[in-house]
Design a protein with these regions (language model features):
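Acidic, serine/threonine-rich low-complexity disordered tracts
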Residues: 22-119, 158-262
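Bacterial Sec-dependent N-terminal signal peptides
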Residues: 1-24
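Alpha-helical structural elements
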Residues: 9-12, 30, 146-148
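Hydrophobic, well-structured mid-protein blocks that either form specific transmembrane helices
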Residues: 113-155
Length: 262
């Protein structure tokens, strides 16, 4: 399995924050989530997401910095090491990205990219030393998202109002390409975990046609049915095997939100 696929799955996992959420301040400062990723029975990778405690400012726009880090572990880190860092600076008032940064280290492959979003002008300025040309402008809609801001936008929706069969979508800009991702509500289930039994909403993610996943219902995702509404568990049928992503830890401002069973 290519290491870059781990990062794709990690970011898709976090996309659902944007697809399911309460009507409240969802850009929580000091939020930290840790996930463990298994390929079959192998502990393959981990992912961490962190939000800054304080607001910053870019072009005089208040922003919250969100960072996602994905890295391989164990045998995967020996033969196919990955350390990817994705950063988004999001305007809390609109939940749109102001600036996005990417730093990929996958084996010998390296790529850095910075995207500045000018939604009022309908332009994204993309800069990468690995691109040719290095700098380019891309026409975008006034509501275009990046991968991480896609993590929040529809989180404004109240999970309790969702119905089985309901569909939600988000359009995101990745590597100079625009993709549309759909989230379909499949049902409500209890999920067993290290934190005990958790009530969750089960969804499926539908992606553009690709060679990575086995079928249309290949990505199944469970979202916690509580005040936090976070991605809790994910299962993926890949063409080369079975992958699972499980919540390992969740904190806000250093305080543990979910306590593991003894």
């Amino acid at each position: 399995m290519k290491t870059s696929n781990f990062t794709l799955l990690i970011l898709l996992f976090f996309q659902v924050f944007r697809l399911t959420a309460q009507e409240k301040d969802i850009l929580i400062g000091g939020e930290q989530l840790k996930y463990r990723i298994h390929l079959g029975f192998i502990n393959a990778a981990e992912a961490n997401i962190r939000s800054s405690s304080n607001l910053g400012s870019i072009r005089q726009i208040p922003t919250r910095k969100i960072e996602i880090e994905g890295k391989t572990l164990g045998i995967f880190n020996v033969f196919s090491p990955l350390l990817d860092v994705w950063v988004s600076h999001i305007d809390p008032s609109t939940l749109l990205p102001v600036k996005a940064e990417m730093n990929k280290r996958e084996g010998r492959y390296r790529k850095q990219e910075v995207v500045d979003f000018y939604h009022d002008k309908g332009i994204a300025q993309i800069s990468s030393p690995q691109n040719s040309p290095k700098d380019k402008n891309l026409a975008i809609s006034n509501s275009m998202l990046d991968l991480i801001s896609g993590y929040y936008f529809l989180r404004k929706k109240n999970l309790q109002d969702l119905e089985i069969g309901q569909k939600m979508s988000a359009k995101i800009l990745v590597d100079g390409q625009v993709y549309e991702i759909w989230c379909v509500v499949k049902g409500f289930e209890k999920v067993e975990s290290k934190f005990g039994t958790k009530n969750c909403i089960r969804t499926s993610l539908v992606l553009p046609k690709n060679n990575l996943f086995q079928d249309k219902d290949a990505i199944r995702l469970w979202i916690s049915q509580d005040n936090y509404q976070i991605p809790f568990k994910m299962e993926v049928n890949l063409k080369i095997g079975f992958l699972s992503i499980d919540l390992e830890d969740y904190k806000i401002a250093g305080k543990t939100i979910y306590t593991a069973l003894p």
